[in-house]
Amino acid sequence: MKNVLILGAGGQIARHVINQLADKQTIKQTLFARQPAKIHKPYPTNKMQTTSGKKVIQDR
């Protein structure tokens, strides 16, 4: 299984990439966005997790 990190997951280009990879069961997506609420639904059917910029900064 390949892991793919999508930076800026709330943007328009990322939306297209997320949809392109959604049907591929051999890919696990990690979506990174400053505002996770802007990540477009429906979420992909393959394995996926989301994280936000604030969380990463606070975890340091």
UniProtKB/Swiss-Prot annotation:
<dbReference type="InterPro" id="IPR036291">
    <property type="entry name" value="NAD(P)-bd_dom_sf"/>
</dbReference>
<protein>
    <recommendedName>
        <fullName>Protein YmjC</fullName>
    </recommendedName>
</protein>
<feature type="region of interest" description="Disordered">
    <location>
        <begin position="40"/>
        <end position="60"/>
    </location>
</feature>
